[in-house]
Amino acid sequence: MSVTVIVGAQCGDEGKGKMVDLIAQDYDLVIRFQGGDNAGHTVVNQYGTFKMHLIPCGIFNQNAISLVGTGMVVNPDELQKEMKQITSAGMSVDNLKISTRANILMPYHRDLDELNEQSGGMSIGTTKRGIGPAYAGRATRTNIRFGDLAHQDYLKSHFEKVLPAINHQLSFFGAAQYTVDQLCEYCSNWYKLYNEHIVDAFTLIHNMMKENKRILFEGQLGVMKDIDLGIYPFVTSSNPIAAYAAVSSGIPARSITSVIGVAKAFSSQVGDGPFPTEVLDNCIVSLRGTGKNIDDEFGARTGRPRRLGWLDIPVLRYAHTINGFDTLAICKLDKMDSLPEIKICTSYRYQDQILSVFPDTEILGQVKAEYETLPGWECTTRGVNSFDDLPENAKSYIKRIEELVGVPVKYIGVGPARSDVIIR
């Protein structure tokens, strides 16, 4: 039995979608285990170019089951758009399954998210997709789940209980309110759309484990956005770490046989929060591109330009400590082809002392990044399919990352497509 987890080792946007698309070709079940449609996984393969927000990137292996997992909050309307994107490319979604326990992100969740951001009281630059309110609803047990869609009487009773408080919040902002009949109609329509896809995920996963099937878990965002261990409060509302793959799916933690951490060859971040290695001059900013190319540094969901900086080794070490990476995938090495020299942040300095542990948010905003400088390679790595064929300075850069983090780099991305990966 093989149970592999792929997670982001930075702040998201590392290239997880591409790596899942590649690695999922050898798996029987691919599970998105947390998050919602607030971030996207970009995939480029023989079927076309796709920006996936909810559906696991394993959907492109038509012989595997792709599961929208229990730990997710799912906007049914956005899910339908993605399904149409897949079928329009000539693929089937018959292998797409949805956990009965996956929470449904309702229209009022999005309303509340946007209203909270607009109020300016505690704006952290969210995507306004309703993720925070949906996870809050899960914690307060006011949400409904996909399994509930089959029970109209229960839904009516549930909304009669919870809707007054929700409408009270909406009225505070002067926003439009909802009726019970309106929400029940939404649910009736969603049930017609998804009835054949809804499954008992717990039983499905355990049955496949008993059959020694290969299972791949796909995380969203990255460890630095973890609600508990990330750069709080500039975080998401779930746990995009390897351990949560087991927690949200109901499998023993020891069932996980390998963890792959995905990182970019540099650093990026969308939204607010401390960013010790951020660079504002043209050297790094030129890597962003214009937004016209699929691999330019703009958010897959929001289209916002990403903040950019040098590779941050303290972040990768921290991510490794939390997740226990067996291997790393370093993506977008090709984006650095034009740089004459490359810096790596090896440590943080705070009040004239080198920090030995990863700091809390307040201190992180005050640290000074300590760098070492390596020569660039100033030639293209696009089209290279062997580590030995990389420029010497590019190989040295990868080896230095391995030395500093203490994890072998198995995968190296040198372009946006599934085929643009060197496997060592």
Curated annotation (Swiss-Prot):
Which positions bind IMP? Answer: 13-16, 38-41, 127, 141, 236, 304
Q: Which domain of life is it from?
A: Archaea
Q: Which cofactor does it need?
A: Mg(2+)
Residue positions annotated to bind substrate are: 300-306
Q: In which pathway does it act?
A: Purine metabolism; AMP biosynthesis via de novo pathway; AMP from IMP: step 1/2
Q: Which residues cross the membrane?
A: none
Per the UniProt entry, the Enzyme Commission number(s) are 6.3.4.4
State the protein's purpose: Plays an important role in the de novo pathway of purine nucleotide biosynthesis. Catalyzes the first committed step in the biosynthesis of AMP from IMP.
Extract the NCBIfam families matched here: PRK01117.1 (NF002223), purA (TIGR00184)
Protein name (database record): Adenylosuccinate synthetase 1
Query: What gene name is given for the protein in this entry?
Result: purA1
